[in-house]
Amino acid sequence: MSSEVETQEQQPDALEGKAGQEPAATVGEKKVIATKVLGTVKWFNVRNGYGFINRNDTKEDVFVHQTAIKKNNPRKYLRSVGDGETVEFDVVEGEKGAEAANVTGPGPVPVQGSKYAADRNNYRRYPRRRGPPRNYQQNYQNSESGEKAEGNESAPEGEGTNQQRPCPRRRYPPPFYSRRPYGRRPQYSNVPVQGESAEGAESQGAGEQGRPVRQNMYRGFRPQFRRGPPRQRQPREDGNEEDKENQGDETQSHACHLMRRYRRNFNYRRRRPENPKPQDGKETKAAETSAENTSAPEAEQGGAE
């Protein structure tokens, strides 16, 4: 009798133990402690991919890894939860304590994610600015021309042609190599005045040689010292059109005057040594000989008569 009573007492104890073990399920070889627990994210490191969630019922901190997030924000590139965000999760038993699993938002919604997590390219906050399509300008001009044609049907033909003018093209500056060719930069841009004499030109040339030469911006450039009057430069073929337009009649008149003046001075210098000044004694002798020669023919003519 006693043995039968003991066996009957052991059977309810075994049934109670089995009933207590039924809610404990496994999630990927981990024992589930609780399900659908609400908690607040204490902190989460996006770079390392882990953080802690504080349970609202027991005020216990639960470890959470980014792989445990079940429904992530579709706009975020990485899985994460934001600091102070309310989430819903399951508590499982890990190697070092309680861990969170199946982390979602309150209800079957995705989590908001951390503000430090990178967004996907398709969900940019400020999209890139793209220019108008290629045929946008042609379509715009065609629409404008159509509207103008409808409005100018009653207007004369002259006014219609004046309104439809092509847009002026923008002029860009020439490249650097055509603006300043190598080794052709003038040292001084001052033009001499017309009223200066030859001596003034020579003194000016000497003064320019005495001045310190301006350093050219090009490395390895050696200035060439000029001797004599400066030569007239021919206009550059690769110069700018604007520079040619700015050259007026004044520069041409200055150049012509300088060429004439230097020619006159040069001829004067060449002729000067050919006709030296005669001395006083030679002048008196020449005058006496000329007087004697003139008197002798006159006397011969008188005797003949």
From Swiss-Prot:
Output a single Gene Ontology CC term carried by this record.
nucleus
Chief place where the protein resides: nucleus
Q: Which Pfam families match?
A: CSD (PF00313)
Molecular function GO labels: DNA binding; nucleic acid binding
Composition bias (Basic residues) maps to 123-132, 257-272
The entry's localization annotation reads: Nucleus
The alphabetized UniProt keywords are:
DNA-binding, Nucleus, Transcription, Transcription regulation
This protein's source sits in the domain of life called Eukaryota
What ranges does the record list as Basic and acidic residues composition bias? 273-286
CSD domain segment(s)? 39-103
Residue spans of biased composition, Polar residues class: 1-11
Q: What task does this protein carry out?
A: Binds the B box promoter element of genes transcribed by RNA polymerase III and is probably involved in the regulation of class III genes.
User: Per its record, how is this protein called by name?
Assistant: B box-binding protein
